[in-house]
UniProtKB/Swiss-Prot annotation:
Gene designation per UniProt: cysE
Entry keyword set: Acyltransferase, Amino-acid biosynthesis, Cysteine biosynthesis, Cytoplasm, Repeat, Transferase
Catalysed reactions listed for this entry: L-serine + acetyl-CoA = O-acetyl-L-serine + CoA
Keyword Amino-acid biosynthesis: yes
Location in or out of the cell: Cytoplasm
One GO cellular component term: cytoplasm
Organism, scientific name: Staphylococcus xylosus
Keyword Translocase: no
Lineage, highest ranks first: Bacteria, Bacillati, Bacillota, Bacilli, Bacillales
Pfam short name (any one): Hexapep
Family: Belongs to the transferase hexapeptide repeat family.
InterPro entries (alphabetical): Hexapep, LbH_SAT, Ser_AcTrfase_N_sf, Ser_O-AcTrfase, Serine_acetyltransferase, Trimer_LpxA-like_sf
Protein name: Serine acetyltransferase
NCBIfam families named in the record: cysE, EPS_EpsC
Length: 216
């Protein structure tokens, strides 16, 4: 019981550290869906370890209904996990998450197919995964990594790295920029790039640089 209360205290403190909108302990305990999902998972995970699979899964599904956050009862979660906003977060069965991790809404820690066994990612300590990011497969995100919004990460990432894009690629490691770096405001828009290319092709057609071989 004391261990569980210590866990609650640590989780509440993590919210205050990560969310400037948090005002009081009562507000965090009563109003933050992310902490509700984590605390519910602690119970479901204990039942899962005792092979009470149906009851564990039932708790998980009820929690998803009320919070919008789906954590499989088999997932292993470290201390001070903060799920901010949380709607649409999915954490798979064989996922392992370290301490002091922050996850935003729409994040998926999932698999890449129907294989059995270890098929979900491992997340190290002090990792931040921004809104909408997908981390897929049996890969390792090492400690102190930042993953940008809407990134799709399919390969393991070394410590002290920043990853953005689809597919995810490292733009900063050990404090040094690698290649061309984009912040969230300047990430490339693939649709815009395709439209620009189409405009170039149309301009070439108008100028006679491209001959139309079709006869109508």
């Amino acid at each position: 019981m004391f261990k569980f209360l210590k866990r609650i205290k640590d989780d509440v403190n993590m919210v205050f550290e990560q969310d400037p909108a948090a005002r009081t302990t009562l507000e965090v305990i009563t109003s933050y869906a992310g902490v509700h999902a984590v605390w519910s998972h602690l119970i479901a995970h204990e039942l899962y370890k005792k092979k009470k699979y149906v009851l564990a899964r039932l708790i998980s599904q009820v929690t998803r209904f009320f919070t919008g956050i789906e954590i499989h009862p088999g997932a292993q979660i470290g201390r001070r996990l903060f799920i901010d906003h949380g709607m649409g977060v999915v954490i798979g069965e064989t996922c392992r998450i370290g301490d002091n991790v922050t996850i935003y809404q729409g994040v998926t820690l999932g698999g890449t197919g129907k294989e059995r066994g270890k098929r979900h990612p491992d997340i190290g300590d002090n990792v931040l995964i921004a809104a909408g990011a997908k981390v897929l497969g049996n890969i390792t995100i090492n400690a102190n990594v930042n993953i940008g919004a809407n990134s799709v990460v399919l390969n393991s990432v070394p410590s002290y790295s920043t990853v953005v894009g689809i597919p995810g690629h490292i733009v900063k490691q050990d404090g040094r920029r690698i290649g061309k770096t984009f912040d969230h405001r300047n990430l490339p828009d693939p649709i815009y790039e395709q439209l620009k290319e189409l405009e170039k092709q149309l301009e070439k057609t108008r100028n006679g640089e491209i001959q139309d071989d079709y006869i109508i």
